[in-house]
Amino acid sequence: TATQATYADLAEKYLGDADYEPRTVMILGGSAEVTQSDKKNSPAIAGVVTTNPAHLMNEGLEGDHVVAIALRGRIPCKVKGPIRKGDVLIASDIPGHAEAAPFKGYQTPSVCVIGKAISEHLQMSEGIVEILV
């Protein structure tokens, strides 16, 4: 059996400690289940707040601040600094943003990986890229 969907990610609802906009990098923690990332290379990565998931799990979850986090698939993500296609992304020191993992003699622990960049953002500023989770 095959199914089709217009959008490209599988997401699940979690209780957040505040309202978060789509594309925000999230970690496990805070006063609820999830909060936005706030430390570079955090090992507590939960995922990225989705925009329009193809499939949404835990749909009945209710609360003051429910966020849908992409678990697999293709989604936009807030980033800091230059990102090239194929870069492994980790949490940055800017809350809710990812950055490219350094590779010169450095191994990124898999628990710290958010996903891989599908598109590019070549400026030093903040921006948005498509990623594969």
Question: Predicted regions span which residues?
Answer:
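Extracellular receptor-binding modules and their adjoining Ser/Thr/Gly/Asp/Asn-rich linkers
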Residues: T1-V133
